[in-house]
Regions:
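AMP-forming adenylation/ATP pyrophosphatase catalytic core
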Residues: 1-54, 72-76, 80, 109-114, ...
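Core alpha/beta nucleotide-donor-binding catalytic domains of modification enzymes
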Residues: 2-226
């Protein structure tokens, strides 16, 4: 690198780090830094940059982290093409971040776009596109900018859907989000949106304002409004946080027995990508069986999300019947051999 370019980079880095003298920014960054440093197996990170205030605050904090800890951090923005201005916004984000010595790669969503359930489908597509890209680059951890308001909204949306314990408590600070082994990290989940907005305005003085965030045709917008109304009835944020924390503790206990069930009552062959399930696997409480089988199907079928609960419950019922022989679910084949089951990917020859 030329001396002139190196000096310019140092000036930019010094300017970015100077903002850490701000008490609020410093407090959030120290917690952010400690969280990432405790991800012992992470050698590099990817950051999902939507261009909104939350993600730009995340971008700034992760850039400071990379400077101070000499850690490789890469940044990705998805041009979803759902709005006419999305490509222009992507260019603005690239140029803005470049002026702060942050190289942001834009991934274009090509192909057919959803006509219904737009927000959910789009969110899942953004995840899958970025995860596909970072897997090629051997990056195993992705940072996303979910914050405290997102936690509450997600909890209520899943409650309205009738989600079980896992669904209601799965929006944690760290969780496996992909069959490809990518870990999703939410380092800002403890913080309010107003704090992140403060950081973004202080550093960048710019962010993309997504009009869908105020469109009441979308459930998330209506839920956001509902939360404000519920405060008047006594369900404030502290009570929501306590409820989610209690559910999360209960969920962790069940996950312990799920891991134990998989370890003791199944075996995995890496050479032919096959699970062998022993009879005692299905002698556990239903929730443990359900989650254990779901995890195995995700791994074998290389699926981002688990099977629908109804489909999986029906499959468990079939497997337990004496007449069960063979079935297909989530891109996997489940076949009974003597008192055991083998599970392997569909359209693949058994070894």
């Amino acid at each position: 690198m030329k001396k002139k370019s190196l000096n310019a980079k140092k000036k930019i880095h010094k300017k970015l780090l100077n903002y850490l003298k701000n008490p609020l920014i410093s407090k959030i960054f120290r917690d952010f830094e400690n969280f990432l440093l405790n991800c012992n197996d992470a050698k590099s990170f990817a950051v999902a940059v939507s261009g909104g205030p939350d993600s730009l605050a995340l971008t700034y904090l992760s850039k400071c982290f990379s400077i101070l800890n000499d850690v490789n951090v890469k940044y990705y923005h998805v041009d979803h093409k759902l709005r006419n201005e999305s490509t222009e916004e992507a260019k603005k984000i690239e140029l803005l971040l470049k002026s702060f010595d942050i190289n942001c790669k834009t991934i274009v969503w090509k192909g057919q776009k959803p006509k219904s359930n737009i927000q959910s489908v789009s969110r899942n597509k953004r995840y899958s596109l970025i995860i596909k890209q970072i897997t090629k680059e051997n990056i195993s951890h992705i940072l996303v900018a979910h914050q405290l308001d997102d936690l509450y909204e997600n909890f209520l949306i899943r409650l309205f859907r009738g989600s079980g314990l896992k669904g209601l408590s799965s929006f944690s600070r760290s969780n496996s989000g992909s069959s490809k082994g990518v870990i999703i990290l939410r380092p800002l989940i403890k913080y309010n949106k107003k704090d992140l907005l403060y950081i973004t305005n202080k550093i960048f003085n710019y962010y993309i304002n997504d009009p869908s965030n105020s469109n009441e045709n979308f459930k998330r917008t209506r839920v956001r409004k509902l939360i404000n109304n519920l405060k008047q009835e006594g369900l404030d944020e502290n009570k929501l946080k306590l409820t989610i924390s209690n559910l999360s503790d209960s969920n962790s206990a069940i996950e312990h027995f799920v891991r134990e069930n998989i370890n003791l009552n199944s075996s995995y062959s890496k050479s032919n990508l096959t699970y062998i399930i022993r009879a005692n696997f299905f002698a556990q409480p239903h929730e443990v069986i359900f989650r254990s089988l779901s995890n195995i199907l995700k791994k074998v079928g290389k699926k981002y999300y688990s099977s629908r609960g109804k489909s999986l419950n029906q499959m468990i019922k079939r497997i337990k019947s004496k007449k069960f022989n063979k079935a297909t679910i989530s891109g996997c084949i489940i076949e009974k051999i003597s008192n055991s089951l083998i599970i392997y990917k569909e359209n693949r020859k058994k070894c």
